[in-house]
């Protein structure tokens, strides 16, 4: 009986993990503020973006590289720094991270702060190249 109970616990744990991963994916991908990498590239090339914002950690940026000319403000520091660095709420911002999750959170925060031209991509900076 214990063996069957252990197996059931592992099945439940696996289902919870899959559900969490799927939920995280859904969160990163489905938002009115998400733009495709292709659209973001087009916006950048046509000078329709003022700031390319990297919200990854220092270690991620130094290890994995970054988009040339991007501004680095780790997600944890965003609310404290963005208004000081970019007081104009009309600033056109594209946000990126590694998976889209933090970029979405940052974009939601920017929208709440009044930066209504903030958008994000749900892929890495390399997709903008």
PLM regions: where:
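Flexible, polar/low-complexity N-terminal or interdomain linker segments that lie immediately upstream
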Residues: 2-66
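Extracytoplasmic/periplasmic/luminal assembly and interaction segments
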Residues: 44, 52, 57-93
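Surface-exposed beta-strand edges and their flanking turn/coil or helix-capping segments
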Residues: 50, 66-68, 108, 118
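Catalytic cysteine-centered active loop of the rhodanese-like fold, especially the PTP/DSP P-loop
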Residues: 79-129
């Amino acid at each position: 009986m214990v063996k069957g109970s252990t197996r059931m616990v592992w099945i439940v744990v696996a289902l919870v993990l899959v559900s969490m991963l799927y939920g995280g994916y859904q969160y990163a991908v489905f938002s009115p503020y998400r733009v495709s990498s292709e659209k973001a590239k087009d916006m950048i090339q046509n000078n329709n973006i003022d700031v390319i914002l990297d919200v990854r950690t220092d270690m991620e940026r130094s290890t994995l590289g970054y988009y040339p000319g991007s501004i680095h403000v780790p997600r944890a520091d965003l609310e404290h720094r963005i208004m000081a660095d970019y007081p104009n709420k009309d600033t056109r911002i594209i946000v990126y991270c590694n998976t889209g999750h933090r970029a979405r959170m940052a974009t939601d925060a920017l929208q709440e702060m009044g930066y209504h031209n903030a958008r994000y991509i749900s892929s890495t900076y390399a997709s903008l190249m």
